[in-house]
Amino acid sequence: MATHKPINILEAFAAAPPPLDYVLPNMVAGTVGALVSPGGAGKSMLALQLAAQIAGGPDLLEVGELPTGPVIYLPAEDPPTAIHHRLHALGAH
């Protein structure tokens, strides 16, 4: 687990910060984010496609190279049949 040291405000004013690590544009690695839009817009499919790519699958979204590693996909609102349909559709590409 990452630990964070306190920030000295005077040192922060004087020294340039280290670069940020992004998972996607404007999505900083190690932070909590939200994917928000009206129902039916494709949020679940987007999340599943990103999860598949990060797990080592193809770049279906053409977002470019992403870091790879273990993924946990937690679709809290969808029944298993809906997830199966999405996975089957992804597998067709």
From Swiss-Prot:
Gene Ontology biological-process entries: plasmid maintenance
Pfam families xref list: AAA_25
Database matches in SUPFAM superfamilies: P-loop containing nucleoside triphosphate hydrolases
Keyword terms, alphabetized: Plasmid, Plasmid copy control
Purpose: This protein is involved in regulating the plasmid copy-number. Increasing the level of this protein results in a higher plasmid copy-number.
Descriptive protein name: Regulatory protein RepI
UniProt organism field: Escherichia coli
Higher taxonomy: Bacteria, Pseudomonadati, Pseudomonadota, Gammaproteobacteria, Enterobacterales
Gene name of the encoded protein: repI
